[in-house]
Amino acid sequence: MNYEEAVAYIEDIPRFTTKNSLDHTRECLRRLGDPQRKFRVIHVAGTNGKGSTCAFITSVLREAGYSCGLFTSPHLVEINERFQINEEVIDDDTFLRAFEKVKKLSDELVAEGSYHPTYFETLLLMGMVIFAEAGVDYVTLETGLGGRLDATTAVENPAACVITSISLDHMQYLGNTVSEIAGEKAGIMVPGVPVIYDGNDPDAAGVMREHAEKLGCPYYELKREDTEIHKITKDGIRFSLKDKTYGDTVFDIPFIARYQVMNAALAVKTIQVLENQIPVSLEALKAGMAKTRWQGRMETVLPGVIVDGAHNEDGVEKFVETAEHFQKEIPLTLLFSAVDDKDYTDMIRTICSRIRFRHVIVTQVGGYRKVPVEELAEIFREDGVPEVEAIEDVPAAFERAAKEKGEDGMLFCVGSLYLVGEIKAVIRRKKL
């Protein structure tokens, strides 16, 4: 197979396999030579902020001189984005070599009457092969869904576990309450391994403490009051962590969203907790935070154009918190879309209750999961936005929204990671 055929094969996997057990994933890893044992892992779970926290940690470790792998999901434009080595997306040849090894294993398993690896399992196995062959020191590993039964949990003996904010999402798989979902996320904890977690939700925090104590894990809880924001500009945020280790140290991050401060704080705390295993100077810590790059989360893709993959109640609440800061002085335009398994009605109502946009445009994404543009437009109208443009084609909708933004405004593109991916693809095509 060539690269394009390999990608097509992987994308077709969900059609002919089902969820496998962690024992199945462990057996696959064993037959691949246990590549995950050739590096140390920092395992990250949570509802929102996983990818950003992974990116902060990876950037700091790179600045400190360590070789790092980064495994995240989903991808926005190309599947290779899920695998980074030293903050660079892998090339097609590296992808194909790993795929061929995992495909050979998959064929052997099926011939033996066992199960083909799932879509996510296949990508995880490829990632472990890629990082082992690259000889990295550390891998920052983001869970796919949940934690307890997530395929990444088969990668045992992490250096630390990190759990970001917990909220209601993927309820059909993880549970109907924050506590139930937190229990699934806490499933990544390993006896004796330190865990650093977002403690802002009291129900989730209680579950984290209970699990950590039961497993004998040293645990570190962070809340918003443990941080102080000094300044927010169009270029980023300056904040400090109320921690005796860092005293008056101020950190700069290149993101405008307030919620990124908690993700950054979790990363800083993780580096601190691991200081005896992974020495990092204060200078490297500060520089790594300032240089962090992450796609699709309050990311500035063009001057004045921000894309954010907020797609659930917690994510939208955090988006609104950021937009509120800018609406006082800058006219705002919104490009919105959503997929049908998200609570887009409540998302829109939250946005409309607190933000007044100069112009609103809706579009549709997600293939068979798309929500018709007129349905989205009608919800905006019901929530007090009489003038809403409905444009099905994403490139046309983005072009219209960018024009409405004008020279003095800001354009926020929100509601779905699919929307973020399509917009980034549009921008990339224009640059070619």
For each feature predicted by the language model, list its residue ranges.
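ATP-dependent carboxylate-amine ligase catalytic core
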Residues: 29, 34-37, 63-156, 172, ...
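Hydrophobic alpha-helical packing residues
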Residues: 57-62, 131, 380, 427
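Extended acidic/charged loop-beta regions that coordinate divalent cations
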Residues: 74, 123-173, 205, 209-250
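Nucleotide phosphate-binding/pyrophosphate-handling subdomain across enzymes
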Residues: 133, 138-143, 149-162, 166-171, ...
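Beta-strand->loop->alpha-helix junctions that form or flank phosphate-binding loops
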Residues: 198-199, 211-233, 253-258, 282-291, ...
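C-terminal helical cap/extension that packs against the catalytic core
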Residues: 201-216, 304, 348-410
